[in-house]
């Protein structure tokens, strides 16, 4: 670790077509084995499917879905005196967005369906409406944090 000060935070790049940082974050998380062009294809097909399903701006649906899934608080395991407690911790917006994207992709991978673009578009539309596996994961995390509120002083 450097003693001179903190390093500057890198700004997230935006994707070539929509010029959107969220789309680029999604592409980087869906990426497997360095196949970025395939990741872009999947995302753009999913965005087209969202456009066809909802007949609204697909980027606003994406934003709304990520905003709906982003957790405010999470639990972290902390060992205190021989026993492990789940300690509720508030998380920042960047980390919350990263968690939301991870949960959305995990939920869409679990879905039954033809291909990833179809599954991802379905999950994003459901999350924007307030349902789906990713929303359930967020609510479960918030319930865990609420149940372990007594351990908040261990932070």
Curated annotation (Swiss-Prot):
InterPro entries noted in UniProt: Ribosomal_uS7, Ribosomal_uS7_bac/org-type, Ribosomal_uS7_CS, Ribosomal_uS7_dom, Ribosomal_uS7_dom_sf
Pfam short name (any one): Ribosomal_S7
Database matches in PROSITE patterns: RIBOSOMAL_S7
GO biological process: ribosomal small subunit assembly; translation
Superkingdom of source: Eukaryota
Disulphide linkage map: none
UniProtKB keywords: Chloroplast, Plastid, Ribonucleoprotein, Ribosomal protein, RNA-binding, rRNA-binding
Main subcellular location of this protein, as a coarse class: plastid
Gene Ontology molecular-function annotations: mRNA binding; rRNA binding; structural constituent of ribosome
Location within or outside the cell: Plastid, Chloroplast
Function: One of the primary rRNA binding proteins, it binds directly to 16S rRNA where it nucleates assembly of the head domain of the 30S subunit.
Quaternary structure, from the entry: Part of the 30S ribosomal subunit.
UniProt family annotation: Belongs to the universal ribosomal protein uS7 family.
NCBIfam families attached to this UniProt entry: rpsG_bact
Protein name per UniProt: Small ribosomal subunit protein uS7cz/uS7cy
Protein's organism: Solanum tuberosum
Lineage, uppermost ranks: Eukaryota, Viridiplantae, Streptophyta, Embryophyta, Tracheophyta
